[in-house]
Amino acid sequence: MGSKMLFSLTSPRLFSAVSRKPSSSFSPSPPSPSSRTQWTQLSPGKSISLRRRVFLLPAKATTEQSGPVGGDNVDSNVLPYCSINKAEKKTIGEMEQEFLQALQSFYYDGKAIMSNEEFDNLKEELMWEGSSVVMLSSDEQRFLEASMAYVSGNPILNDEEYDKLKLKLKIDGSDIVSEGPRCSLRSKKVYSDLAVDYFKMLLLNVPATVVALGLFFFLDDITGFEITYIMELPEPYSFIFTWFAAVPVIVYLALSITKLIIKDFLILKGPCPNCGTENTSFFGTILSISSGGKTNTVKCTNCGTAMVYDSGSRLITLPEGSQA
């Protein structure tokens, strides 16, 4: 409609018709909203009348055009490993299990259950999904493979090797071996895992750090602020002295003072098997006063349940005769 109207405006016949009938003194009143006639001014004193036409599309045509557009399904899977059919798309857990099965079959059975391209696509998909399985260390992957092999009835490690590997991962602070409160039907005990509280262990060095800073500034004072003068030298000399001389000396003094007062210290935390409240226990020696060896008895701050913290096995157990 717009193209036809533009053609009629630029037609020479229309301009000739307008030039024959000038309307210099004619000033029409503004049309009402209900009027179908629109006045268009071409030049001063010249105006023409255009007839407005309204085209109504049938409702059936509009619904037919909008229907297929709204019903399109866009699959977000871009890798060859993924299935286009959403009903067959595997979950992250299924892909992780297949990844571990491929590793186990290749390293322990000597058989490849998938090609190198399929394995790379699976690994890339897991990394894209944010899975932590592909970022595990060799010991963590071995532990997961041993767990899956034991469940399937084909163990690759004996009980002693499995327990040693699990304890090693606990000491290293791995998250895949940490479990919540659980009950053992064989020993009829309630267990919970312990983890290292690195933040509180770091706070133990704060008093010694303050003392080391005091000694550093005292040495600067008795030397006539020679250390401050060196730290104010132009770059890069001040940067080198600060970060490669002053800071290492302060850190070394702080750690030495801490180890002189507190020896073989370890802070462990874990949830209460009864209520789940996190409790902390200290292991070590403060000024020749021992905390009690490798086991401590701790009372829950919430429910008052007595618990036994074992730093050797990194487990929380309830004493004999107690009820969870």
Swiss-Prot record:
GO cellular component, one term: cytosol
PTM note: Disulfide bonds; Cys-300 and Cys-303 are probably involved in the formation of disulfide bridges with 'Cys-11' and 'Cys-105' of PGR5 while Cys-272 and Cys-275 are probably involved in the binding of a Fe-containing cofactor (FCC).
Effect ascribed to mutating C183S: Loss of photosynthetic cyclic electron flow, loss of formation of oxidized monomer, and decreased FCC binding and dimer formation with PGR5. Loss of dimerization
Biological process, per Gene Ontology: photosynthetic electron transport in photosystem I
Stromal side: 61-198, 258-324
Membrane-protein topology: Multi-pass membrane protein
Region called Disordered, residue ranges: 16-42
Phenotype upon changing C303S: Loss of photosynthetic cyclic electron flow. No effect on FCC binding or dimer formation with PGR5. Loss of dimer formation with PGR5
Record localization: Plastid, Chloroplast thylakoid membrane
Deleted gene: phenotype: No visible phenotype; due to the redundancy with PGRL1B. Pgrl1a and pgrl1b double mutant grows slowly and has pale green leaves.
Induction annotation: Up-regulated by drought stress.
Similarity comment: Belongs to the PGR5 family.
Protein name as it appears in the record: PGR5-like protein 1A, chloroplastic
Organism name: Arabidopsis thaliana
Gene that produces this protein: PGRL1A
